[in-house]
Amino acid sequence: MPPAVSVCASSGISVLRKRSDFLKAARARRQGAGSMMVQARKRDAGEAEGIRVGFTCSKKVGNAVARNRAKRRLREAARLVLPDMGRPGWDYVLIGRPSDTASRPFDGLLDDLRRALRKLHAPKP
């Protein structure tokens, strides 16, 4: 089985690696969902193209096993949803929540991500 990074890369999504990219996303838009928090920012014109996504879970989520399980679920949800609903030129950071990210049914996790992306990209009144 290929590593998770290459799974995201095959769908045209690259993974955020630098701390500065995560910090820039943290200062931009954010939208809470039942099982995760989604941060999003539109990149400047000179930056990389395409959709980029990062995943994080704090120690509040649990031990390393629980955090990695939550991130695997977020990674798979992003792989399924972002190619259709994500926008090129945007960075997304998916943050796992304690107990909800790992225990929520996967269909609910997908719905949470879709709803958060719709709200993030909705025109402001």
UniProtKB/Swiss-Prot annotation:
Pfam families: Ribonuclease_P
GO molecular function: 3'-tRNA processing endoribonuclease activity; ribonuclease P activity; tRNA binding
GO biological process, one term: tRNA 5'-leader removal
InterPro entries: Ribosomal_Su5_D2-typ_SF, Ribsml_uS5_D2-typ_fold_subgr, RNase_P, RNase_P_CS
Catalysed reaction equations from the record: Endonucleolytic cleavage of RNA, removing 5'-extranucleotides from tRNA precursor
UniProt-listed Enzyme Commission number(s): 3.1.26.5
Keywords of this entry: Endonuclease, Hydrolase, Nuclease, RNA-binding, tRNA processing
EC class: hydrolase
Any Gene Ontology CC annotation: ribonuclease P complex
Superkingdom as given in the UniProt entry: Bacteria
NCBIfam families in alphabetical order: rnpA (TIGR00188)
Role noted for this protein: RNaseP catalyzes the removal of the 5'-leader sequence from pre-tRNA to produce the mature 5'-terminus. It can also cleave other RNA substrates such as 4.5S RNA. The protein component plays an auxiliary but essential role in vivo by binding to the 5'-leader sequence and broadening the substrate specificity of the ribozyme.
HAMAP family named in the record: RNase_P
Entry's family note: Belongs to the RnpA family.
Subunit structure: Consists of a catalytic RNA component (M1 or rnpB) and a protein subunit.
Name of this chain's protein: Ribonuclease P protein component
Organism of provenance: Ruegeria pomeroyi (strain ATCC 700808 / DSM 15171 / DSS-3) (Silicibacter pomeroyi)
Lineage, uppermost ranks: Bacteria, Pseudomonadati, Pseudomonadota, Alphaproteobacteria, Rhodobacterales
